[in-house]
């Protein structure tokens, strides 16, 4: 049934057409979806070579309207910083005992991990577990910090991390299908502006090669990458 629905949805998408961002989002919202609130995603192909250190594009941004998802945050901290994390709304706070749960019991009930710098000797041992899942705390993404309270609050409000994959593509969440089109658009243009700001100096020519929007169970819709604002 799901396969038939996807085929019907694909038939409504003009494969060779470049939709404006608004048109693409309106189309995705019109299509019959799954029985849950699907996630709307953006896939942005950049003209970069991720194998070169001077062309790695990564960072974080606050989506103006959030992601629509409640993210569970684990914090590695002790003492006053542990209390600060708890007060900010962290779901799990610990140190050696949290690392042991992850390492020995396979505990992975969180979406983001944050750590104070002094905890990285402990967290480092979890690299083979957290790394492949994209959960390893990193200073560049603001998840290795002494300001754990602020980090937790921002993540809870909709801060997302972006990073090009080996093909030079950014995959990120724009929100939920239940969001209105204007909210999704605002999130997309915030992402686009952030990627333009993060453009490596070494990149020549056209920077954003292509853009596509999709939903969890829906088709991909090609988007005109030149549109900066609607």
Swiss-Prot record:
GO biological process, one term: translation
Key words, A-Z: Repressor, Ribonucleoprotein, Ribosomal protein, RNA-binding, rRNA-binding, Translation regulation, tRNA-binding
InterPro entries: Ribosom_uL1_bac-type, Ribosomal_uL1, Ribosomal_uL1-like, Ribosomal_uL1/biogenesis, Ribosomal_uL1_3-a/b-sand, Ribosomal_uL1_CS
GO cellular component: large ribosomal subunit
UniProt keyword annotation of Repressor present: yes
Pfam (any one): Ribosomal_L1
Domain of life: Bacteria
A GO term for molecular function: structural constituent of ribosome
Subunit structure: Part of the 50S ribosomal subunit.
Family in the record: Belongs to the universal ribosomal protein uL1 family.
Biological role: Binds directly to 23S rRNA. The L1 stalk is quite mobile in the ribosome, and is involved in E site tRNA release.
Protein name: Large ribosomal subunit protein uL1
Organism field: Rubrobacter xylanophilus (strain DSM 9941 / JCM 11954 / NBRC 16129 / PRD-1)
């Amino acid at each position: 049934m799901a396969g038939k629905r996807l085929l019907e949805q694909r038939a409504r998408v003009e494969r060779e057409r470049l939709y404006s961002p608004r048109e693409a989002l309106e189309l995705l919202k019109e299509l019959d979806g799954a029985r849950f609130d699907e996630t709307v995603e953006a896939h942005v192909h950049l003209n970069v070579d991720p194998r070169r250190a001077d062309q790695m594009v990564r960072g974080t941004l606050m989506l103006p309207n959030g992601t629509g998802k409640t993210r569970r945050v684990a914090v590695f901290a002790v003492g006053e910083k542990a209390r600060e994390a708890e007060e900010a709304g962290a779901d799990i706070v610990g140190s050696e005992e949290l690392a042991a749960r992850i390492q020995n019991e396979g505990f992975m009930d969180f979406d983001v991990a944050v750590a104070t710098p002094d905890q990285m000797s402990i967290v480092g041992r979890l690299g083979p577990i957290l790394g492949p899942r994209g959960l390893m705390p990193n200073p560049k993404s603001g998840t290795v910090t002494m300001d754990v309270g602020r980090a937790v609050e921002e993540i809870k409000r909709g801060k997302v991390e972006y990073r090009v994959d080996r093909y030079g593509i950014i995959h990120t969440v724009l929100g939920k299908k239940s969001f209105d089109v204007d909210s999704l658009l605002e999130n997309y243009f915030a992402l686009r502006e952030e990627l333009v700001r993060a453009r490596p100096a070494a990149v020549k020519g056209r920077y954003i090669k292509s853009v596509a929007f999709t939903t969890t169970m829906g088709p991909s819709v090609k988007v005109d990458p030149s549109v900066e604002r609607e």
